[in-house]
């Protein structure tokens, strides 16, 4: 069956009113061939549409539809993309998927590198598998912003790091995007002694030359698990080397701020934690454009928590039951600080923070999002947890109550004997959770896009 075949029709939608039926295949909108979700969303935006459908017997029919500008037609297809996701053509020396243990669910080993997922879901792509036709389509459809894994603009070094002889050509694609005003948010996974130092200076300089099309740059330290046998030998950052990268990026950012009014580049929070330095203040991160890469995440969390706490009356907090928070090693001191602030306002607040050492991936992995259910159970069983356990929601797979190791929240609750509440990366929600106020269940927070993509991704 064609992936543009209609799987369901929203009964309250323009498509239903026009008489589109399940099983028909969408072929054209206003004369434009529909290949995937980008074509569908772009060409169905207008208020007046001429939709061509192919019926199961091979015959075609055309419908004229009137709707609100930007209103969705109301069609669901076999997959979210209306096509197969494009897999990565690289063999990056730092690829995290290559460092995962065996025996995990198959979908976790799929490496996507798809421009459509970059635009729709915020995924990062390397641009190495884009054909000239696809590059032109991004320009023609104004697909923007896109998130680009750059790593280095040195063409030879990029080919070496991505283990793809054509990887350097992607810099030319970026320059073409910049000339056509396609906005790009860029990521640099920094590997000690490889693409930092002078190579990082060149990368920042070259990307600044594409400003304002290059809208932001994040520099994040490479993650190294214990599963690297047979892989490229990588080292990790220590206090001194992490500090050197911070100085380098902050120096560039200060010069760019003076010249163009924006810092453009930021180190992730993890670099500051590795270097043992205080995180920059809220205003340093400007619009927080790189939160998904951990840039300014803890600063924003702290500021949101402060504001929420200011609005909270002590009597609202008085009924909070004793609790504990499980998180990654790196974030634990910051959460302890937030609990202390809550306790200063209301002396009855009783909470503990437990930093979970990552035995599943290796102790060098200290972020909360990679903590597994098995490690939670092993390290918290028999500990004083109070009456409830709070965990960051990013420990769980999107839309599920399941950790990366397939241990469920129900398993953890049963083994530890306390209810588990997943809290989003949001200071207001964290404050409510600490104070014992009800927060919105995960299932109700899911957007339609997350649901559709997750259902698709399960079938990869």
Regions inferred by a protein language model and the residue ranges of each:
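PDZ-domain C-terminal substructure recognizer with occasional recognition of PDZ-binding tails
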Residues: 41-77
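Radical SAM enzyme core and accessory elements
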Residues: 5, 275-460
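Flexible glycine/acidic-rich beta-alpha junction loops that bind and position SAM and/or redox cofactors
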Residues: 158, 193-194, 214-240, 260-283, ...
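Conserved PDZ fold ligand-binding element
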Residues: 17-35
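Conserved Radical SAM active-site core
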Residues: 60, 67-213, 222-252
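Short, surface-exposed secondary-structure edge patches
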Residues: 14-19, 41-42
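Terminal peptide-recognition signature
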Residues: 15, 23-26, 51, 95
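PDZ/PDZ-like groove recognition
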Residues: 1-10
């Amino acid at each position: 069956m064609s992936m543009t075949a209609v799987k369901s029709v929203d009964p309250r939608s323009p498509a239903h009113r026009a008489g589109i039926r399940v099983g028909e295949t969408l072929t054209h909108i206003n004369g434009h061939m529909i290949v995937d979700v980008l074509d569908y969303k772009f060409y169905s935006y207008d208020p007046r549409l001429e939709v061509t459908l192919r019926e199961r017997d091979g015959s075609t029919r055309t419908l004229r539809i009137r709707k609100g500008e930007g209103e969705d037609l109301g069609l669901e297809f076999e997959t979210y993309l209306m096509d197969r996701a494009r897999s990565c053509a690289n063999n990056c020396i730092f690829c995290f998927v290559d460092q995962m243990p065996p025996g995990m669910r198959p979908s976790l080993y799929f490496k996507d590198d798809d421009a459509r997922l970059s635009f729709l879901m915020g995924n990062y792509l390397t641009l190495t598998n884009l054909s000239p036709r696809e590059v032109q389509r991004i320009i023609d459809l104004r697909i923007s912003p896109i998130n680009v894994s750059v790593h280095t603009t040195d063409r030879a070094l990029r080919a070496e790091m991505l283990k793809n002889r054509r990887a350097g050509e992607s810099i030319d694609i970026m320059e073409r995007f910049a000339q056509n005003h396609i906005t790009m948010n860029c990521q640099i996974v920094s590997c000690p002694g490889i693409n930092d130092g002078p190579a990082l200076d060149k990368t920042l300089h070259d990307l600044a030359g594409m400003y304002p099309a290059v809208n932001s740059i994040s520099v994040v330290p490479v993650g190294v698990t214990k599963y690297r046998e047979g892989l490229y030998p990588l080292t990790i950052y220590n206090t001194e080397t992490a500090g050197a990268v911070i100085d380098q990026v902050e120096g560039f950012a200060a010069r760019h701020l003076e010249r163009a009014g924006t810092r453009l580049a930021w180190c992730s929070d993890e670099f500051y934690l590795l270097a043992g330095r205080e995180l920059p203040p809220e205003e340093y991160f400007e619009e927080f454009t790189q939160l998904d890469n951990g840039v300014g995440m803890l600063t924003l969390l702290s500021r949101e928590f402060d504001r929420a706490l200011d609005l909270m009356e002590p009597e609202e907090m008085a009924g909070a039951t004793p609790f504990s928070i499980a998180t990654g090693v790196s974030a634990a001191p910051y959460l302890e600080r937030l609990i202390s602030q809550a306790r200063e306002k209301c002396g009855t607040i009783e909470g503990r923070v437990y930093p979970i050492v990552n035995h599943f991936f290796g102790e060098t992995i200290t972020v909360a999002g990679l903590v597994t259910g098995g490690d939670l159970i092993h390290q918290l069983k028999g500990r004083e947890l109070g009456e409830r356990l709070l965990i960051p929601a990013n420990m769980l797979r999107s839309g599920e109550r399941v950790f990366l190791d397939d241990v469920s929240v129900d398993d953890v609750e049963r083994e530890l004997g306390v209810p588990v509440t997943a809290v989003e990366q949001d200071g207001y929600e964290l404050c409510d959770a600490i104070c014992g106020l009800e927060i919105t269940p995960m299932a109700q927070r899911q957007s339609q896009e997350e649901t559709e993509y997750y259902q698709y991704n399960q079938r990869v």
